[in-house]
Amino acid sequence: MDESELFKGLMNSTAYCSELAKVDIPFYKSIDTEFNENIKSVSSRFMRLIELLLSKVDRSRAEDIVDVEDIDNRWAEVSDTLDILFEKADYSIDKAQGLLKKPAIETHASTSDVANKKPKKEKLPYKVIHAAHLTKPQLRFRVQPNNSREFVWSWKLTEKPHSLVPLEKIIAQVKLDPSLKNSLPHPYEPEIQNSVYPPWVSEMSNPIDTGSVDETEPIWVSTESQLSDMLKELQNSKEIAVDLEHHDYRSFRGFVCLMQISNREKDWIVDTLELREELEALNVVFTNPNIIKVFHGATMDIIWLQRDFGLYVVNLFDTYYATKVLGFEGHGLAFLLQKYCDYDADKRYQMADWRIRPLPREMLKYAQSDTHYLLYIWDHLRNELISKSAERKENLMQSVFNSSKQISLRKYELEPYDPIYGLGTDGWRNVLTKFGSSKIIGREALMIYRALHDWRDSVARKEDESVRYVLPNRLLIAIAASKPVEAADVFSISKQLTPIARMYVEDIVKVVQEAEKLYNEQVDREKSQFKEVEKQNQPLAVFSESNTLGDYKVDSSVFEISKQNRSKLKTLLANGSAFWIEGQSQDDLRKARKERLFIVNQNIPFSLTLPCTQGHVESELNVKQSTVTEAANPSLNGEKKQEPIVIRDLGLNKQKRDSSKLNHKEPSNPIEERNEDIEPSEASTSVSKKRKQKKKKKNSGKLTIEAEHVSNDSPIINEAPFDYKNQKNFIADLDSDVGKNKFGKRGFNPLNKVSLPKRNTRELKKRKVSDGKSTSY
């Protein structure tokens, strides 16, 4: 089989698997035995192939995989192994075809090929993505960030332009209600809720072309005078486009590095690192209800504006929600730029480090393009919303505005660290669920993991670094699972330790050791508590050698309240029934019972405690060496010994009783004749016997398969090669002539869609466009 046929078969298999995943497989397996057997055969084949694949890399890791659950739990290892093998195979194929050798004579592609193929973009240099040796800009901030867990955040707002409710009134309300200090109200909530959009927004208009981004030079704003000039022009605009570039990798809380603002004529790029404390002046424009502020994916932008600059937005239009209402295929800004402007945004710079100064021209142009075309896109979206509203007979424009209002009402609030329950975005519970559910096993590993997670958060706050920079989540899980004893063990876990982790490697080992010590102390404490409870919970012995009745007056009545018998009766019956004790309050009795817990013998689950009689006393005096049971239940005047009531035996299921005994009439006194009617051991014998036979029958098939498997020294490697080319497709056969009846018609095939998968490889490779802006750096 050559490379083209192999690739074709691989693509067909991928297509079938993609379609098969959409079908309710368990349902069809339950109604079609042939389909069930075929699925089992394919699954076992896949299992053996994966085991063979891993064995080529590491035999010890392959032996640990037994079933599908192991693959699910260790899919990261399987995926990494596949990536390594694919890269090596790709490299070997290129080398065999001579693609890696530089040709002696340079060849030039035809003009048609050049026109059809886009040039492949190289990866950005590492220094552009992470400027490791850059001095932290936050060290130059006039107000240093406070990362402590006890810090209470407050508004940065000092004045409130375009207000319906004055700022002083809101501050007075917070002072009167202390509960509002933990969750401050939105200062512009009344203005946002009561905002009315200008009438011209609902009118159709021709989109205003802003020209190419290459034809317009952005204006860099880094001084107060430049900021003032920009404000004057923005106040005369009807609509503006705004975007932010954020960084949160080398900072605990993160900060905004750039702000891009555009109107119909100009593009501004504001250096927010230099003008951090002066940008509150933009509220004059941002809170003006007569100026429409166009954002794309403003969910986080609104939060960052409040946190860093004290800025709030009134009359926001989020183009992301317009794409949702219109039902577009994509919802990202790159999709809109391609759809309306035929502009291919270089998304490599999404991951760039925007702290770099001065900015390279490529990064500057990328930042400018985010807002340069946004007002032109807003014109197109507005026209489509108006036209679609007439077709659907609903106000789609108002729907987008309502969603945008909810985004404007978002508030910035600090997320507290929760060491107990691990709640929150970066809480230990969320990280454990995503990355360590299969690796952190046992109470000790969990305690070490939680201690390391707490330590990571503390160091990140202290060094003003993100938790990902201090200790990535996967490395955190790996350290907690391996339980390093010394620094060398930590370095052996991963070769890519972060600089902070290398600097604090001794502290990491110390945290692990302290967590182990705490766990051992907790285990010892639980063992001692269990022993204490077990010691207190000894079966009650009313009469024993240590509890003799030598000083008890035998010839007197047991129930006679005399000075001689009073103390002895209290000693013997304090743990029995409070009814027989005179002169003690209910509180004293309750306290005595709590101090002395007792359990009934396990052979008698529920028993009735009876008062002592004179027969008990005489028996104890005559036979000192008798057992506890004989002392507590002696024969009385030759009468038949009375057994305690055992509720569990009387409550047995009728099917578990002897069938011959069920035909007899129920005895008048079930307590006395219980042992004659019911034999629990005999009743349960047949049930346990049936279970053993069933289990033996079930395991017989497994033992046969295992015996055959063990007989072969290397069943996977010695197996005959699988003929992929001539393999029968059982899904496609469901629509073949085999299934026709005598009238020449085929029956209903529920897997018809699966047998006709999409063969368009581009569609299979096409990635889903993400919703809006998810992460920024």
Swiss-Prot record:
Binding site for Zn(2+): 243, 245, 370
Lipid metabolism listed as a keyword: no
Residues reported in the UniProt entry to bind AMP: 245-246, 304, 347, 350
Residue stretches making up the HRDC domain: 442-522
Annotated residues for binding of Mn(2+): 243, 245, 301, 370
Impact when changing residue 243 to A: Causes slight growth defects and accumulation of 5.8S rRNA unprocessed at both the 5' and 3' ends
Keyword Nucleus assigned: yes
Keywords, alphabetical: Exonuclease, Exosome, Hydrolase, Manganese, Metal-binding, Nuclease, Nucleus, RNA-binding, rRNA processing, Zinc
Bias kind Basic residues: ranges: 688-700
Domain 3'-5' exonuclease: 219-385
InterPro entries, per the entry: 3'-5'_exonuclease_dom (IPR002562), Exosome-assoc_fac_Rrp6_N (IPR012588), HRDC-like_sf (IPR010997), HRDC_dom (IPR002121), HRDC_dom_sf (IPR044876), RNaseH-like_sf (IPR012337), RNaseH_sf (IPR036397), Rrp6-like (IPR045092)
Biological process terms in GO annotation: exonucleolytic trimming to generate mature 3'-end of 5.8S rRNA from tricistronic rRNA transcript (SSU-rRNA, 5.8S rRNA, LSU-rRNA); histone mRNA catabolic process; nonfunctional rRNA decay; nuclear mRNA surveillance of meiosis-specific transcripts; nuclear polyadenylation-dependent antisense transcript catabolic process; nuclear polyadenylation-dependent CUT catabolic process; nuclear polyadenylation-dependent mRNA catabolic process; nuclear polyadenylation-dependent rRNA catabolic process
Mutant lacking the gene: phenotype: Severe growth defects at all temperatures. Accumulation of 5.8S rRNA unprocessed at both the 5' and 3' ends. Accumulation of a subset of mRNAs, such as early meiotic mRNAs targeted by mmi1 and iron homeostasis mRNAs, and non-coding RNAs.
Compartment(s): Nucleus, Nucleolus
GO molecular function: 3'-5'-RNA exonuclease activity; metal ion binding; nucleotide binding; RNA exonuclease activity; single-stranded RNA binding
Residues that hold UMP according to the record: 245-246, 304, 347, 350
A cellular-component GO term for this protein: cleavage body
EC number of the protein: 3.1.13.-
Chief location of this protein within or outside the cell: nucleus
Region (Disordered): 630-702, 743-777
Biased segments, Basic and acidic residues type: 655-673
Subunit composition and interactions: Component of the RNA exosome complex. Specifically part of the catalytically inactive RNA exosome core complex (Exo-9) which may associate with the catalytic subunits rrp6 and dis3 in cytoplasmic- and nuclear-specific RNA exosome complex forms. Exo-9 is formed by a hexameric base ring of RNase PH domain-containing subunits and a cap ring consisting of csl4, rrp4 and rrp40. rrp6 specifically is part of the nuclear form of the RNA exosome complex; the association appears to be mediated by Exo-9 and not by dis3.
Record PANTHER family: EXOSOME COMPONENT 10, POLYMYOSITIS/SCLERODERMA AUTOANTIGEN-RELATED
Biological role stated in the UniProt entry: Nuclear-specific catalytic component of the RNA exosome complex which has 3'->5' exoribonuclease activity and participates in a multitude of cellular RNA processing and degradation events. In the nucleus, the RNA exosome complex is involved in proper maturation of stable RNA species such as rRNA, snRNA and snoRNA, in the elimination of RNA processing by-products and non-coding 'pervasive' transcripts, such as antisense RNA species and cryptic unstable transcripts (CUTs), and of mRNAs with processing defects, thereby limiting or excluding their export to the cytoplasm.
Family as reported in the entry's similarity comment: Belongs to the exosome component 10/RRP6 family.
Protein name listed in UniProt: Exosome complex exonuclease rrp6
Organism field: Schizosaccharomyces pombe (strain 972 / ATCC 24843) (Fission yeast)
Source lineage: Eukaryota, Fungi, Dikarya, Ascomycota, Taphrinomycotina
